[in-house]
């Protein structure tokens, strides 16, 4: 007849998930016998395995982050166009504040360009990313200047600069459908 230890040994071999807690003491892994090795899962190793996929995925994430920084100003242009449309061409405090902020953000970004280029140093395409960043900010600044010109805030006539020159006379007046 089978002894209880043989049953436990056979059970341990047959069911690898069964663990015998009754025998053994506080011995280390190197001192354990063949029976105690069944306590560790299949494929367990004491050695550390180097993972090269982590380094590769980190490089991909750095490139992606650098492109996000470079494309940031270009992503703001549709919102700036919407703000330009909503502000209208009238001169009041809110449209002027919106236009000033629209022009100030690219100026701030252009002044902080060296700090931004430091973030792009780890990228392999830093020249192209820096160029895209610069073009995006210049386009944002051009939108702000265009909006200032369409609101009449930029001096475009000689009478804007000199007090003794009369402003140009309008050739035509419209009144919105009312007879004047």
From Swiss-Prot:
Lumenal side: 85-95, 146-180
Membrane topology type: Multi-pass membrane protein
InterPro entries according to UniProt: TMEM85/Emc4
Keywords assigned by UniProt, alphabetized: Endoplasmic reticulum, Membrane, Transmembrane, Transmembrane helix
Transmembrane segments annotated in the record for this chain: 64-84, 96-117, 125-145
Cytoplasmic side: 1-63, 118-124
Swiss-Prot/TrEMBL GO biological process terms: protein insertion into ER membrane by stop-transfer membrane-anchor sequence; tail-anchored membrane protein insertion into ER membrane
Top-level taxon in the UniProt lineage: Eukaryota
A Gene Ontology cellular-component term: EMC complex
Places the protein is found: Endoplasmic reticulum membrane
Family label: Belongs to the EMC4 family.
PANTHER family for this protein: ER MEMBRANE PROTEIN COMPLEX SUBUNIT 4
Quaternary structure (record): Component of the ER membrane protein complex (EMC).
Described function: Part of the endoplasmic reticulum membrane protein complex (EMC) that enables the energy-independent insertion into endoplasmic reticulum membranes of newly synthesized membrane proteins. Preferentially accommodates proteins with transmembrane domains that are weakly hydrophobic or contain destabilizing features such as charged and aromatic residues. Involved in the cotranslational insertion of multi-pass membrane proteins in which stop-transfer membrane-anchor sequences become ER membrane spanning helices.
Protein name: ER membrane protein complex subunit 4
Gene behind this protein: emc4
